[in-house]
Design a protein with these regions (language model features):
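N-terminal exported-region signature
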Residues: 1-216
């Protein structure tokens, strides 16, 4: 996930206190765990737990799941830079930022070479796969980035789709395989990524570019 929203603290980022959590939780006491990541994909700080225990009058971010360990300086002391990724754990829960929704281009950089990076459509409108492009240095062969769309429960809904950029073969775009020999039926424009829908990406050092949304 990536808190890249305008009007949240400022245009360069937000504070943990700007984020709240809603929805049904399968974790005990309604906790949601969040870890800010460095540019290389390692944990920068945290984890921080969202605790919502009405019987104990507890609601907010803590350093433990029981809500007994306060964050030094409070949640407002934890900064999340614009475009910075965070790992989250809490099936069925929604992380809700304060302020206006994003209206500008967003660039996610995949940091994990052995696992997947959690990303998503953080714009308020549905977009299609053909609107997404990939740039940057790749450790994967032929510059591929693999993307899997997820259901609300976190399972793969469709894909994987591969970004292929092989100038010698005049291939550039999304395909069903890494070699770029299998076309997506109906093309990339037929694959819709709903507003707020998450997806997994694999391709260390590659940047997935999401265009600014077209708003009515």
């Amino acid at each position: 996930m990536c808190p890249n929203f305008l009007g949240v603290g400022n245009e360069t980022g937000c504070k943990l206190s700007d984020l709240t959590v809603t929805g049904y939780a399968t974790m005990s006491a309604g906790q949601f765990m969040l870890k800010p990541l460095t540019a290389t994909g390692t944990a920068e700080s945290g984890p921080y737990y969202w605790v919502d225990i009405p019987a104990q009058g507890k609601k907010g971010w803590f350093l433990n799941a029981a809500g007994t360990s306060q964050i030094p300086g409070g949640a407002e002391s934890v900064s999340l830079a614009a475009g910075r990724a965070v790992w989250c754990l809490g099936k069925g829960l929604k992380l809700v930022p304060a302020g206006m929704v994003n209206e500008s281009l967003v660039a996610f950089t995949s940091n994990s070479g052995t696992g997947y990076t959690a990303m998503g459509n953080c714009t308020p409108v549905d977009i299609t796969l053909d609107k997404l492009t990939v740039s940057g240095y790749a450790t994967m062969s032929a510059g591929q980035l693999m993307l899997k769309l997820l259901t609300p429960t976190g399972t793969a809904e469709s894909g994987p789709y591969y970004w292929v950029d092989i100038p010698a073969q005049s291939k550039r775009g999304w395909f069903l395989n890494a070699a770029g020999t299998s076309q997506i039926p109906g093309g990339a424009s037929s694959v819709t990524i709903a507003a707020g829908r998450g997806f997994w990406c694999l391709g260390k050092g590659l940047t997935l570019n999401i265009p600014a949304p077209v708003l009515d």
